[in-house]
Amino acid sequence: MAAFEHLVKSYDVGELLDDIASADPPAYLRRCFAEGSAAPALSWPRVQQLAVCAMVLDALINDRDYEIFEHELIADWRMHYAKACAKLKDSAVQALHRILERNRPEDPQAVAELESLVSRLSGAE
């Protein structure tokens, strides 16, 4: 899936995946979404981090393949963490809504990509 290029443009996805892998993936994602929802303001790199974490969650619980992710790593995480990560959908959607309400990107294509992530995680897509 070659989507979401506006959200991940110039973002080091590999480094984030390494950070998630070196931690407990469900705990890392939970913390990321909680911090994103609670922060008074979000920088563009922080918005990108939340979007990539939401993409990881979507890949794990909705069995989607994203071109930018290492497929073997995601397959391993699906096997071990899908059940625990399924509980994070609501917090991910809440964090993405928070971005759209308070830190809406200027790029309309990035906004559309965020809205698509919300739909995917909400089960509408």
PLM regions: where:
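Amphipathic alpha-helical scaffolding segments comprising HEAT/armadillo-like alpha-solenoid repeats
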Residues: R30-R31, D63-H71
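Catalytic toxin/effector domains delivered as secreted proteins or via bacterial secretion systems
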Residues: W44-P45, H71
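Generic structural signal for well-ordered, non-membrane alpha-helices
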Residues: A27, R31, A51-M55, D90, ...
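Alpha-helix initiation and capping sites
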Residues: S10, S22-P25, L50, N62, ...
